Amino acid sequence: MSTAIWILLIVLALIGGLFGGVFIARKQIEKEIGEHPRLTPEAIREMMSQMGQKPSEAKIQQTYRNIVKQSKAAAAKGK
């Protein structure tokens, strides 16, 4: 085989590997964020305290459930 064909094959393999790696990394990150949301009830409690509110535990849990529900809906819409 000529040198040009080898170079073309190497370039195509690199491009394919790049796209494959990006796709796999994206799926893993989406899965991780879906399983372990970055916003926790403790973080919500802290944010509400910083805004001058004294929220009840029920209000914190309600807010957390709404955020999780919205993130799952956004993830399902994106698929």
From Swiss-Prot:
It is a single-pass membrane protein. InterPro entries: UPF0154. GO terms for cellular component: plasma membrane. It holds the Pfam family UPF0154. HAMAP family: UPF0154. Belongs to the UPF0154 family. This is UPF0154 protein SUB0399. It comes from Streptococcus uberis (strain ATCC BAA-854 / 0140J). The lineage of its organism: Bacteria, Bacillati, Bacillota, Bacilli, Lactobacillales.
